[in-house]
Amino acid sequence: MAEKGKTNSSYWSTTRNDNSTVNTYIDTPAGKTHIWLLIATTMHTILSFIIMILCIDLIIKQDTCMKTNIMTVSSMNESAKTIKETITELIRQEVISRTINIQSSVQSGIPILLNKQSRDLTQLIEKSCNRQELAQICENTIAIHHADGISPLDPHDFWRCPVGEPLLSNNPNISLLPGPSLLSGSTTISGCVRLPSLSIGDAIYAYSSNLITQGCADIGKSYQVLQLGYISLNSDMYPDLKPVISHTYDINDNRKSCSVIAAGTRGYQLCSLPTVNETTDYSSEGIEDLVFDILDLKGKTKSHRYKNEDITFDHPFSAMYPSVGSGIKIENTLIFLGYGGLTTPLQGDTKCVTNRCANVNQSVCNDALKITWLKKRQVVNVLIRINNYLSDRPKIVVETIPITQNYLGAEGRLLKLGKKIYIYTRSSGWHSHLQIGSLDINNPMTIKWAPHEVLSRPGNQDCNWYNRCPRECISGVYTDAYPLSPDAVNVATTTLYANTSRVNPTIMYSNTSEIINMLRLKNVQLEAAYTTTSCITHFGKGYCFHIVEINQTSLNTLQPMLFKTSIPKICKITS
């Protein structure tokens, strides 16, 4: 037992000794470290477990939140869709409503309002235009004007050079410029269009022609067409006549021998209203009625008719007609050139040439003004003045050009270019040369004729192209000329280049002694009649419009045709 107790005692002793050994180890620094590591590991494990539990809980809550958000977004989408559809429907209804209102306004409301305002404005303008002092304002109510840089050719401005001397050149030969022509024509095969008259103003042009329904007889029933327009530039930068408004006057009025003036934004026309033929008219006392027409760019027209007793004459006339060519405006007066037969001849010596002509003296020249075919009336030119032409009843005053300053009275035209007035008269008598010069309308009235010696016109055998000696005859054809130089020595014209026949229309640039440049329109057999030439400048460059009555041979009728050329002016520098 003692051994046994010893053994146990030894065991416990040993045990105690072991524990003693452990306690001793714990108390050592290494033991304490191990204890703290164990505690830290345990705490880490516990914290990891707690974090894991928290993460799991967070995931569960997040999933629940996402499901909730998805449901919320879906609900919002449904709401947005509903709102969108509501707004779209509101916009659609509003657009439809406004469209209906706009359509109603466009179709009825606005036109009614515009028509009312237009009528009110027209009435206001018309009321104002009845007052003479507001005439200029009224003329500017429509803004239509030639293209920039275009104006009637003024010889004083055109015939000059920055360096050198202005001359007409023969090189290169002139040619026709391309472009449209919108001159009025006839709608009948046997119809005839006669007596073209063109006036180019500062703002617009006026063109008039006579449309005879059957044949070309002067007394035939006819329409008169007055056209207003402006000069534009085509794609080739050449000038064109561009019509804006046209008015056709009643065929029953039978206007004849009309002359035109373009002034401001209106066209003015003076015509004869003959009821008898020319020879019968010259055999009677007093003239046939005249009519003065006014046309504006809105198409409004006004006419004044005058009988012989309504007109103030300086001498009694048996017949008198406007001269076909254009007239001029000076302040409040329009002046047309006219011609006719005096009831009682004037005393004095007319223009005369006696050298190189056998058995010719001044009395032969004086007698040559009295035409047998026209009942021996003395035929003279006159100035037909229309005073206060915008008044309710303009006054017409006729002043005779002294026979001492003129040749045989005939058709012709007036041009006011700058401060100078030019006159052309048809060479209807023995004097076949071109008759163009400057006119002084002051008292006494005088004409300074340019001494042209190469340009002429065809005529009957006794007064043909080459005739130079005074004798009684009435012949020739209207082929006016446009002055390019201030003295009218240099001119542009379209001549019928033949001795006795109205054929071979030829555009010519000439001075008094030499034809410088010319262009035959077709051939020497081409039949033609009246021609008129008017010129303009475009920023200093010169162009001419040539209107020629061409005989449409296959139809045996006349029709004015428009041609254009560039003026062959050069500046010659002499060394």
UniProtKB/Swiss-Prot annotation:
Gene3D superfamilies the UniProt entry points to: 2.120.10.10
Cell compartment(s), UniProt: Virion membrane; Host cell membrane
InterPro entries in the cross-refs: Hemagglutn-neuramid (IPR016285), Hemagglutn/HN (IPR000665), Sialidase_sf (IPR036278)
Region annotated Involved in neuraminidase activity, chain positions: 254-259
Parts of the chain that traverse the membrane: 35-55
Cellular component terms per the entry's GO annotation: host cell plasma membrane; membrane; viral envelope; virion membrane
Keywords on record: Disulfide bond, Glycoprotein, Hemagglutinin, Host cell membrane, Host membrane, Host-virus interaction, Hydrolase, Membrane, Signal-anchor, Transmembrane, Transmembrane helix, Viral attachment to host cell, Viral envelope protein, Virion, Virus entry into host cell
Gene Ontology molecular function, alphabetical: exo-alpha-sialidase activity; host cell surface receptor binding
Glycosylation-annotated residues: 77, 499, 511
Domain comment as written in the entry: The C-terminus (head domain) is involved in binding the cellular receptor.
Function: Attaches the virus to sialic acid-containing cell receptors and thereby initiating infection. Binding of HN protein to the receptor induces a conformational change that allows the F protein to trigger virion/cell membranes fusion.
Protein name in UniProt: Hemagglutinin-neuraminidase
Organism: Human parainfluenza 1 virus (strain Washington/1957) (HPIV-1)
Organism ancestry: Viruses, Riboviria, Orthornavirae, Negarnaviricota, Haploviricotina
Gene that encodes it: HN
